[in-house]
Amino acid sequence: MNTVSFRLALAQAASGLIGGMYTPFFGAWLGWKGLSPSHIGALLAAGMLLRVAVAPMGGVIADARDDRRGAMLVFYTIAFCGYAALNWADITALIFAAAIAANVASGAVTPLLESVSVRLSEVFRFDYGHVRVWASISFMLGNVLAGIAVSRFGLGVLAPWLSVVLILNVASIYALPAPPANRARGDFALRLRATFAEARELLRSKVFLVFLACASLDQGSHAFYYSLGGLHWRALGYSGSLIGILWPLGLLAEIALMSMSLHVLRVIGAARLLMLGACACVLRWTVMAFDPPLPVIALVQFLHGGTFAMAHLGAMYFILKSVPPRLAATAQSLYAVCSSGIAMGLATLASGPLYAAYGGRAYLLMSAMGLCSLVLALMLMRRWHGGRLTAHGEEEAVATI
């Protein structure tokens, strides 16, 4: 592992650690602070909706400035201030403001970090998966550490922990190589207008729109599993400790696939990875909809390597090969917004009423999303021939931080 890939691995690990601590316990922490379920839902939904505007704008500005590292430092600093404020916020309005700011800012870093990681993996010839895998490993570690801390000290420990981990995130981004001071020349307003114009050209590409819809439906199909999967398992009589064993099985499959991602990509290709990820979605969620026996659930958990990891790798390498480096952060932000924001948000909103009405059969909606993703993946395989999608797509790959 060279110096650049090592620094990126540290940044990915810090990012995964904060996610692993936040995801399972932040909703419970909000309840501990006295927020009602409706307030919690509104707060989390507001964060998702704001990401739709903030993440693409952050990506466009980072591309126009040709400085993704600086944008990540700004966003992580805002997130740190938000989580730090939660240690003292007792009024609902202040909790809303601080939590949403932290959620939106930390979420805006992810596509920027991915764009840098994927692009530099090509420039410095290392395996992107060997860097990205540390986010998955540290996410699992964050689950464990936060669980131990909450069990021992109560939910009140979460906000201080998140604040401390955000310091690690800021430090890990600061440790990345700084871009040359004179790299982005010319008037910023002119560069910003030029980036917007190229982004519009990208969004007029039918191939890119098919990709966005395909990848977003795949990732959005995880909404019921992420939001209500644990609750449904509890309703089936599974203990918290058993659920704690089942959940990481999917992460183990994800880690295994990420560790050999370059070989997988060379053999299968980006578009076929998206297709296989969609097939895994159809199979996984259809089986889960019928409440199979525990051994079957355990086996199906390993399909997370297909439903998430294959689709994610396919998306990352599609963007790498189809989008010019100067638009990398913009494309990554659009992908993140459509998948983690719009598709995941709408599917999460639908999951609650569907679960109340149909129980575990609500997984069939996720299966239908996977089927739509499969159709779009097949269209992508026919329409995309492996090249750049914009008129000015041919440019030298440069070490863009």
Describe every region a protein language model picked out.
Residues G70-A84, S163, R272-V287:
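Structural signature of the two symmetry-related core transmembrane helices
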Residues F26, G107-E122, M310-P324:
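Intracellular juxtamembrane helix-capping segments at the cytosolic ends
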Residues M1-N2, L176-L212, E396-A397:
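Juxtamembrane intracellular "pre-TM" segments in multi-pass secondary transporters
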Residues M1-M48, V207-L246:
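Helix-loop boundary and gating motifs at the non-cytosolic
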Residues V157-A175, A362-L380:
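Symmetry-related core transmembrane helices of the 12-TM Major Facilitator Superfamily/SLC fold
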